[in-house]
Amino acid sequence: MYTMAVVYGVFFSCFGPSVKYIFFMEGVHMFKQYEMELAGRTLRVDIGRVCAQANGAALMHYGDTVVLSTATASKEPREGIDFFPLSVEYEEKMYAAGKIPGGFNKREGKASENAILTSRVIDRPMRPLFPKDYRNDVTLNNMVMSVDENCRPELLAMIGSAIATSISDIPFDGPCATTQIGMIDGEFIVNPSQAQWQDGDLQLTVASTKQKVIMIEAGANEIPEDKMIEAIYKAHDINQTIIAFIDKIVAEVGKEKHSYVSCAVPAEMFETMKQVVSPEEMEVAVFTDDKQTREKNIDAVTEKMKEAFADNEEWLAVLGEAVYQYQKKTVRKMILKDHKRPDGRAINQIRPLAAEVDIIPRVHGSAMFTRGQTPVSYTHLRAHETLA
């Protein structure tokens, strides 16, 4: 069936749009389209057109930019982990810009730096909206199929990921939406073109839910603080219109969220943990200025609890998360009540700073900057004038 689909795909692509319309008029494949006006252009979402076996899929159109966003989840939770296994992919294809990879190898290369950073930007607002105790593998994949320089595909992938996940049966406390704001000559530009994004004084990306802003990423020249705040509020307001649009799609084609095996820490487990290791003992374990000593203390606390819960497999499975939450509550109490951090610093006190220069011979310049227990080494090398 897959081979036949590929053959038909090549056939129809050769004959252009006229054959495509006949193909869909025959009723072979039905899908739904949704449209909204966004920053003076039409945002179109095709649901059910492709990827029928994914938990959720949306074919996004904005100008001539096209991005396929899918959300898939494993049927069973991954065993032996204490985190949510989410993977986000953003795939750039040369054909999307009408180009063919050059050189001897005509295949696509590895992910670019922009693709990796875009994947992270998609991940940041999405990850907190999944249940913390969800252990099924989830993959959000975004494939750029066509690029219009006036409509940035990164933005489309962010919105597409939210739509694909929201209409899927994967547990998700969304939707969320993303807007980009640029600024040229003091005027805001909503969802700017690639040239406006690069040449403007502001590069602001804001992700929101209905209730609040959940992610801000920005690069800018020097601009007034009130301008930045105004841009954030403007993006948040636009996000609300996108969220209303997503809600409409979910109401019509959204799937019922499936149930899952919760890996949350039982409330009674916390009470028992306090009997094994008292809050005062946990404070002593956490309160040290040496990170390695603190980690050894926490390991000792964990081992003590393992011995106490040796007969309870359910509690042992979530022990790592339970100890982390216990430690987190202890640190929070120390900061709010005693105004001290775990290493003894006051809340307004920075770590010790140190700087050295000329630490490496045979290079034109070198330096080492240390903050607390974290050193960073820098080197500078100037090429020979014959290589200029």
Where are these regions (language model features)?
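Flexible, glycine/charged-enriched surface loops at secondary-structure junctions
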Residues: 132-138, 173-175, 242-260, 292, ...
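Glycine- and acidic-rich phosphate- and metal-coordinating loops
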Residues: 101-104, 123, 133-147, 215-217
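Noncatalytic alpha-helical scaffolds and linker/capping helices
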Residues: 270-356, 360
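Conserved phosphate/anionic-ligand binding catalytic regions in large, soluble enzymes, centered on
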Residues: 152-165, 169, 358-377
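Alpha/propeptide regions of enzymes that mature by internal proteolysis
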Residues: 31, 55, 83, 109-130, ...
